[in-house]
């Protein structure tokens, strides 16, 4: 009776997909982010792990957005590669506006050496959006899973 789809959610997982190839795939147009420059996947993975844990994520939100708190817990930030397709899954107890796209942009920066993956916690601590990577385009961002507490959540997660 007090259930709301947004308010009752205890955690969510978003997936961001990057097609890392110099040649665009017409079948993926408007469905993924095309990124033609080669990415160092090992650095990308290390950067993702640096976001895990409880942090103040003000440095990876849209400038000018207001929330009660910018502290969130990222349960995992994992990258997988299948040929040219890179999928980045980010699961957290909540998200700020454009947070996933900015996290991925920061991971991409780390992938080609603009920042060091190990410096990401210090960059987050500055709360300065200008020090982290760009907000990636919306193509490629998908809400993948949501978790709810109690009976409703159990039924939803079994689907």
Labelled PLM ranges:
Residues 1-159:
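Structured-RNA-binding interfaces characteristic of tRNA pseudouridine synthases
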